[in-house]
Amino acid sequence: MTTSPSTPSAPAVTSITKVGFGREPRPVPLIDLATPLLTIDLDALDHNVVTMAAWCREAGVDLAPHGKTTMAPEIWRRQLDAGAWGITLATAFQVAVAREAGVPTVVLAGTAFAPATLAALAAPGTDVLMWVDSVETVRLVDAALARAEAERPLAVLVEFGSPLGRTGARSVREALLVAEAVAASPHLVLAGVAGYEGALTHDVDAAGVAVVDEYLRGLLDVLDGIGAPAFDPWLSSGHDVVLTAGGSVYFDRVVAVLGDRHDPSGLQGPRTRVVLRSGSYVAHDHDLYRRLTPFARDTGPTTAGGAGGVDADVTVAVGDGSAGSQADREMGGPTDGELTGFDGAAEGFGAERSEEPHAVPAGSSPTGPGAEASTGFSFLPTLELWASVVSRPEPGLALLNVGRRDTSDDEGFPVPLEAWRPQAADRRLPGVLDGSHVSGLNDQHAFLRLDPASGLQVGDLVRLGVSHPCTTIDKWNEIATVRGSADRRGVPPVVEGSITTRF
């Protein structure tokens, strides 16, 4: 159940709340707790943290995972302890949470304008690298910092974008003009170049990868066009130039195209760090990222210019691997259904949906809990939603007490995984969800379509996977913690405690 930090909750261990379970942590059987309930598997979480850290070490790049996925300082700390260089965030409020939590370095993938906010970003204690994408932005930020009498310059990254993309300078020339404006500002210091390839396409076939690679080469053009002397003030303060890109879908391509520039020792030029910002990997999911992660595309750390395991000739359509799931609810790429080149890239991440199965390169291994490929790397889904059947008004329909107030629906509906009967001796109900799928969500209800002959009853528990963890986690102030997936346990989980989020 979701709770509001401004609304006190009843002190009962029948729900996960700050007043109840969170204040007196002790193991509680999940079947004794109120639904809906979001759980996070700590074993899977630690697996994902360690896996991504190991992959980055092998690839020879740094990682500043996007903290907006979880907004949970406890999880950020796990990532930092595993070797993350910093944490990426999207808003000044999120940066304030990170500063309070002691995060040493933050990439602010956005821009602030209020003088007091900018002064706080520039304050000692946490190194904040804020994005700027236009000369006008630089002018406004510079003037605001002057009014605020900030005690030190604010480090900024020039954001490079793309026509029809999201934010970011639309050409190399525009980006270079932004860099010149930063260099001329007494209140800013140029720290590097940033971009986000995931705003351009969601396709993982050869055409989609070509769009991503061309964009990433543009980032290199911006970095080279700026030239080493422009970074001297930043370098002289003991920092390294930052070249950053990479969400959770194309981080392999970032390494392939940009990886050779990672040179924190300065052996080939100015000290430079290539920093990935992938965030969703830490939670992973049962649908969207399960299909699109590079680890499902038979790709591992790749040297610059490598193919990353993409087969341009053969593709196969894949689903979720579980009966009746929402795996075929895909996002489209470009609005016309085709990629026509760099300038024809889609307007945004998941801008529209297609009913066709998504095409991924042959050689993938999307089945299994982590979509594990032959690289030996895999992510595991950490999140599960538990809901009760509250109505069986028709033979082929069950209503669950979970809705869009509790879970995401922007990139697919929850995925039915398993059913349990809390009051029965043999609680597991094999087969009752065969062929089932969630067809829609209201605020507090999910429409579960199933075989009219299914034995699912009112009062049964349904275990659901999620698609797109970011927009599920943000609905929960407390997430119940368990260990070991239900698939491996064979018994209902025991809730050990909870993780607090700071949305």
Label each region the model flagged.
Residues M1-A120, D311-V314, E338, D343-G344, ...:
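A charged N-terminal "starter" segment
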Residues D43-T51, L177, E214, G218-D221, ...:
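A non-catalytic, amphipathic alpha-helix used as a structural packing/dimerization or gating element
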Residues Q326, M331-P334:
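Short polybasic linear motifs
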Residues A283-T302, G370-A424:
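Internal helical hairpin/lid segments
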Residues S162-G319, E330, E338, F342, ...:
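Active-site loop/helix belt of alpha/beta enzymes
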Residues A307-V316, D320, E338, F342, ...:
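C-terminal accessory subdomain/extension
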Residues D62-V209, D311:
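Active-site-proximal beta-alpha core segment in soluble small-molecule metabolic enzymes
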